[in-house]
Amino acid sequence: MENFDGKSMPPTPVPIGSSQFYRWMPHPIVDTPPSDATWRKPVPRGRIRDLVAAFDQCSGMLEQKPPPPPTQRVESLENEHIAPPPTSKSSKIPEILAKKSEKYISPYEKRHFHGRRGTQAVVFNSNNAQNAPNVGGAYPYGATPLKLRNLAQKMDKEELYVADDVGISKKSENFENSDDDVANFQELLVLDEVLENAENSENLESQQYDEESTLNRTFQDSGVPENQENLLQLPECPKTPKFTSSPTLFTPYAAGEPIVEYRCSSGSAGGPLKIVVKKLQAPIALATSTPKPAMCRPPKHSEPPPAFQDSFVSSISNWSAVDHHATDSRRQMNRLLNSIDETRHHILLAEHSLLEAQKSKCPMQELASQRVLLICRERLKVQLEEVRRLQAMTVVRHPPPPINRHFKSTMVISNISLQFNKHFHSRGSYAFLVLLKCRTEVEATGVVTLLAQFQTPQNFILFGEHLRFSNLPVDFTIGMEIYMMRVPEHRPPEKTCAAFLAQKVRNLLVPSNAAHRRPTTSTPQKSIQNATSPACDFQLCGNLTLDRDSSGDNRRFYLDDVIYPLEGTVKLNSHCTSLPDAIDMEYRGFLHILHDSASPLERAKKVPIWHKYWSLLHRGAILFWSTPQEEVHEKVPIFQIDLTKCTNNSIEESREMSQGAEHEFHIELLIDQDPDLIEKRRVILAAESSDHLNSWLSAINDTLDILRS
């Protein structure tokens, strides 16, 4: 007699000849009983004879049953690509049911372990149990559905289908279009779905996620190569904020070779002085009044043939031709200088108004003066930078050709809405302002304050102005800056009886016309100049860069450099004029760019360093990424080449392979990253093959013709 837990006792046997029998298990019952099972009350203590007989009957039944098949070990996900040996579906059914039953703790098992005296006996029908085989192993017969049990018996006799990791493949020689086969195929789909769900649940539980591998949001699948990047594509929603290209893309400074540098500095006489800092290439002669002698003399073998288009710069006059570019630059500079004088005058008036508002303790007048002072100072800053840039451009010998006026665009921005932090409650203490800048144009919205008496449950602020920018280039960028300041609180003095009597006495003793008889010591203009310049109290709390691609209705964007109380997003409406279809064409491919040598040893040996990039020609600019996947996933390009700043009349293949690469061509650009310094650089590129070279040259030259037509 085997030992068993004292808390569980065997059931009482039924009379001989009954149609039902009891089954007792030494291990806890963890399965779901059938619907026709009935329960018996706990057996009282003291009936030792009946307990011994019942135990002998149950132990004899367990010895006749075969042991359950061993559970196969589930392989880890690392070996998932290795195909397991083919096995029949019927052999997997008891394993899956056993694994599922081991993880599930039934209420009967809980009741068994909680210390109830006696055994809960489950009664099964003896007719079905004696006639049907035990498909589920040591588990009750009613735990397996009827369809799956019959299908497993049929699959043991004849194998019609073969299941693998990908799906269910049908053997063509054993399958015919009959009603029985169709029914079997439907039942097989049900079986495969049950087995697949059980395997997926086990794989998910056994999988261990690595924190480092999940930081970049990349997911590797067994059917995808490891070197291919797969990003989780989220569905685009108009309410979801977007990121914009915050800084303007620049031409790589390390690419190519410098040709000429132009720097602008102020001379001793007070006027601007243009100086050429570096000239690495001899200038090409423009014209001369005296041609070369002996032009018709036959050349010698040692001398190169004469170039009839070459000539020397004439020493008679300083200008060999009319320089329209210099004339236009002077006109623009004169207009800017006049605008600078007006801006400085407006700054003086705004400072004087601000001082008066602070003395009179008028908050609304102080906010208006602060707004005008901020706008004028920002406008003066960009105007001075533009003047320095134009002064440096006047000495450029071959400036870029002018752009067609049809490519000038107009953009209107309206309904700017800022979102507040959810913890922001002091609405009456701040005033907000939005400032927009593009080259020398500076526009701003009105000052909006959130007064305490107008508190609403909405946690955003709306600017209803329409701001318009015109005469914009193809690759324009508009900078948006959000400013805030604390609203000055000027509380009126308390009117006590003593203060009221003192004011009455002062009015009686001092005559009303005493202020008119006071002598004026200085003029208002001199007082404005002598007064100290007050500081602007508006503080930058967020910025954003807008371009042509950011136009649309109800667009949401993330802000940069956000501080409290802003939440970090902005919603606005923007509309921009469309470009002609000819400039909107796209051309893609790989290009190699020559970079400068970083180490002194490589510079001494003149070892060329080529880098391969994925390139896109679109809207008059060539954008560069490291791989094509970066463009697909809308990552920010590494740099760009702006063809509007190209000084070449046309792009052609280089005749000499100076850097040891085939299919070369170069583009000369004017780079003005610093307003006081303009550099002319030659960017050397190379294509993959001759066909790619011809395609790139054709696409770039067509773009230049469209821009300059």
From Swiss-Prot:
GO BP terms, alphabetized: actomyosin contractile ring assembly; mitotic cytokinesis; septin ring organization
Alphabetized InterPro entries for the sequence: AHD, Cytokinesis/Rho-signaling, PH-like_dom_sf, PH_Anillin, PH_domain
Domain annotation PH: ranges: 584-705
Domain of life, source organism: Eukaryota
CC annotations in GO: actomyosin contractile ring
CDD domains hit by this protein: PH_anillin
PANTHER family (alphabetical): ANILLIN, ANILLIN/RHOTEKIN RTKN
Protein name: Anillin-like protein 3
Taxonomic placement: Eukaryota, Metazoa, Ecdysozoa, Nematoda, Chromadorea
Gene for this chain: ani-3
